Swiss-Prot record:
Gene from which this protein is expressed: cspA
Domain of life where this protein originates: Bacteria
Annotated compartments: Cytoplasm
InterPro entries (UniProt xref): Cold_shock_CspA (IPR012156), Cold_shock_domain (IPR050181), CSD (IPR011129), CSD_CS (IPR019844), CSP_DNA-bd (IPR002059), NA-bd_OB-fold (IPR012340)
A UniProt-annotated Pfam family: CSD
PANTHER family: COLD SHOCK DOMAIN CONTAINING PROTEINS
Species this chain originates from: Mycobacterium tuberculosis (strain ATCC 25618 / H37Rv)
Residues of the CSD domain: 4-64
Lineage: Bacteria, Bacillati, Actinomycetota, Actinomycetes, Mycobacteriales
Keyword Signal attributed: no
Protein name: Probable cold shock protein A
Listed GO MF terms: DNA binding; nucleic acid binding
Amino acid sequence: MPQGTVKWFNAEKGFGFIAPEDGSADVFVHYTEIQGTGFRTLEENQKVEFEIGHSPKGPQATGVRSL
């Protein structure tokens, strides 16, 4: 499962980007893909693992879990 670091995440808008550890292009992340209960958000520089899915706008992180 790919891992990366949260580049930025806007909690008000519910989305942001993850920089994958392998150096590939940043991946879009939507709050609905963050695993867990309650308020789902990510912090800048937080380490995460995720799968890569595809949306009409390109690659998107799915099943995002904090490490």
